[in-house]
């Protein structure tokens, strides 16, 4: 209904009702006129706004909502996370780990999958990357997008820095390579192709993952390093000197010399640079591992001819908020790398 039609209808109703009311209220002209106007408005106002244009707008809005619903992505198929353990001869204990199996794992009994080992940070455990942020949901989405599945193992590394401690500490590096990796391969359908083997981690775990790729490149080909603890220097009052013992040399809790001897880049000479690659992410606002230290580490990798996808941004800090922001991209990178390797 157009505005001119509305006015005409309003006028007709006022005149009609005015005449009727004047007949009944002859001595109250003002009252009758007011009542007529009020009644007319009550009659026609409900119809105002139900014009073809308004109706079309409502219909268009409904259509847009329907189309938007159609465009929404289907919920990604959910993988399965199993919490379990096995006995590690190297560590001399029942060793906890979690494993993520892609949604199609059980329905494809003859299929093998790439594997990613994920390492937690200092003071953490194997549950961190599943509880502090939802790695399972992230992997579901990444797998759906990439069209590439993977088995992901969440390792309990204690506070070991994932090395073989020189002074009565854990032999974590040996435990992973000699106990965990063979056990995972015998228990789950892991691809034997080294191009399908990746390892990643946050903070201390990023340091460990870098060492495994460079020191064990015969098995690992890809590394995911999120805020890796690759310090070039530490302030004299840094808490690490007194609170950690992984790099103890028997005389001090933290031996800077031992840390340097085991630093990941010490193994660059063992690596064919064309056979390994890294995803590295950090923020310039990191207050634990200075971005300059990560820059220097990445530069060493690149100078050695290694392919590095380096994502440096700002905001957040050395914390779960930052890692939850970059982890989906890291997982997607690994899956894309696996898919690319399979196509060659």
Which residues are covered by each model-predicted region?
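N-terminal secretory signal peptides that target proteins for export/translocation
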Residues: 1-27
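Intrinsically disordered, low-complexity segments enriched in glycine/proline and serine/threonine
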Residues: 23-25, 29, 59-62
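Enrichment for repetitive, rod-forming helical segments
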Residues: 16-19, 33, 127, 192
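Low-complexity, intrinsically disordered segments with a bias for serine/threonine
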Residues: 23, 36-38, 65
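Sec-dependent N-terminal signal peptides
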Residues: 16, 27-41
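Non-catalytic cap/lid and distal C-terminal segments of serine-dependent acyl enzymes
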Residues: 52-344
């Amino acid at each position: 209904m157009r505005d001119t039609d509305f006015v005409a209808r309003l006028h007709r109703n006022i005149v009609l009702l005015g005449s009727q009311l004047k007949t009944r209220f002859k001595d109250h002209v003002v009252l009758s006129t007011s009542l007529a106007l009020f009644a007319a408005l009550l009659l026609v106002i409900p119809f105002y706004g139900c014009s073809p244009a308004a109706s079309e707008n409502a219909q268009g809005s409904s259509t847009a909502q329907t189309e938007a619903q159609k465009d929404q992505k289907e919920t990604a198929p959910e993988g399965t996370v199993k919490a379990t353990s096995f006995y590690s001869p190297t560590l001399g204990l029942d060793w906890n780990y979690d494993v993520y199996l892609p949604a199609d794992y059980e329905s494809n009994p003859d299929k093998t999958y790439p594997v990613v080992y994920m390492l937690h940070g200092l003071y953490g455990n194997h549950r961190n990357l599943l509880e502090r942020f939802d790695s399972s949901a992230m992997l579901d989405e990444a797998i759906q997008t990439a069209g590439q599945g993977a088995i992901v193992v969440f390792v309990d590394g204690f506070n070991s820095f994932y090395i073989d401690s020189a002074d009565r500490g854990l032999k974590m590096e040996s435990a992973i390579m000699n106990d965990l990796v063979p056990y995972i391969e015998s228990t789950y359908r892991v691809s034997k192709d080294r191009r399908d083997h990746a390892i990643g981690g946050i903070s201390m775990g990023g340091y460990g993952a870098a060492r495994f790729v460079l020191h064990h490149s015969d098995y690992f080909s890809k590394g995911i390093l999120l805020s890796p603890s690759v310090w070039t220097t530490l302030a004299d009052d840094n808490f690490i000197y007194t609170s950690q013992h992984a790099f103890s040399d028997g005389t001090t809790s933290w031996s800077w010399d031992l840390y340097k001897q085991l630093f990941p880049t010490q193994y660059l000479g063992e690596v064919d640079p064309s056979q390994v690659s890294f995803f590295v992410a950090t923020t310039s606002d990191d207050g634990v591992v200075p971005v300059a230290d990560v820059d220097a580490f990445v530069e060493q990798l690149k100078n050695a001819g290694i392919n590095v996808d380096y994502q440096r941004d700002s905001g957040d800090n050395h914390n779960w908020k930052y890692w939850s922001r970059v982890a989906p991209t890291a997982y997607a990178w690994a899956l894309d790398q696996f898919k690319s390797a399979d196509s060659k």
